[in-house]
Every structure is written in structure tokens, then in C-alpha cells.
């Protein structure tokens, strides 16, 4: 089988938010309250939109190049990133939706900008030699987990949310290199 190598995500403060912080229009600060994760408060940075989403040069491309330099005839470097659905979910949760709506009046607009940002990062990773990108996606488990109403709000339409999660994931890889 393939002997994949990664950086073990050791450069990241969190497995998913650091990737988001590499995009224009995304801000973060040390949390005051944290988020509940398996009954405990996780003190991860609060992350929200401060403008429309775009990306110039994402720092994860440089992370990948570091790992790529360690390849040999028995190994292949791969890059892990949070799925586009994870990115989308972050900005539609009740804690963020009001701020998100300052920049995106519809989920469709948000989905398109996220997908376009991912396409750029995927292309840049490809140009750096990456042929193995892994999307880490916890959104589906969160969607069906006990407490999902707390995550998405009491008026959440879970069928619609699941369709949007699927759409943003598929759009991001449409036309992949």
C-alpha cells in the first residue's frame, strides 16, 4: 500500500481552524467561552468572517512543501485539510450567522466563495507536487449527533443543511487538477 507521510498537523493550534485562518476574510481571537466538546469546554479561538472569503497564498502549501522534501522511494507526502463543509459549517452556526450575513446574504454566495478558495488551494498544492489531499470532515457526525439542535439552532432544516454540505464539498473538487 501507499506509505503516506504528513506533518502530523503539529504546526496547527487546531485541526481545522488554522486552515480557515489562512483565508482572507477570516479572523480569530482567543476565546472567552470556548465550545463544548464531549462535555468539556475546548478553549479554541473564536473564528468569524470579517469580509468576503478569498485566498492568496495559503500557508498550508508551504507546510506541504516541507513534508514533500522528506519523500523517498517508499513514501508519498499527503496534505490533510478540513473539508469545505467544515469551513461552511463554521460560519452558519448560530454564533456566527449574524456576522456572516454582513458579507453573504445567501448561503449560495458563501458556498461559492468557499469552493473557489478551496479550488485555489488545491491547485496550489497540486502545483507544489501534491497528489494526495485528505479532507477531514466532522460535519456529518455533528449533523446527526445528539445536541445538533444546539449546534445549528432550533429552526434548523437538517435536510437543507446536508444538501449544502454536500454541495460545497463537490463544488470545491469540481474541475480538480
Which residues fall in each region the model found?
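Domain-level signal for soluble alpha/beta catalytic cores
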Residues: 1-177
